[in-house]
Amino acid sequence: MLTVFQALSMEELYNPKIEPQNFLKHVPVLKSVEVEGRLYTLTFIRQFENASVIHLHVDWNETVDMETIHTRMNRPKFKLRALEGYNCQSDGAGGGTGRVTHRFTVSPALPDDVSGFSFIFEEYDDNWMGEKTGLEIEIKIS
C-alpha cells in the first residue's frame, strides 16, 4: 500500500517530458521579490511554439567555505505551482556562489503578454520525494 501512495505522490515523474520546439523569442519580465535575504527574480520567459520556459533566478550574499559547500549540495528545490489550464514541469537548476537559476517548462505556451498572471514557486527540501518547506514565492505580473 505504501508503494501505491509513493507512486501517486510522484505523479510528475510519470507525465511525458515537455520538449520545447521551435524557439520564437524572449519575453523580458524582470519582476523581483525579496524574502529572508534572498532576491527572487522572474527574469524572462523563452517562448517556443508549443511551450514556454520560465527562469527563476535566486540571488543571496554568500561566501565560499566548507559550510557553504555543504549547504549548496543540499539546496532546496522549487516547483512552479500549476497554472490553471497549463502543465508545469521543473526542468532543473544551475548556479554558483550566491546564485542559482531554476527553469520551468509550461505547456501550452503562455501568451506573450503575461500581465495579470501570478507565478507561485513552492520550496521543497528535495527534488522528488521532498516535503514542502512552507516557503512560497509569489511573483505577480501587473
Which residue ranges define each predicted feature?
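Surface-exposed edge beta-strand/loop patches
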Residues: 1-55, 59-142
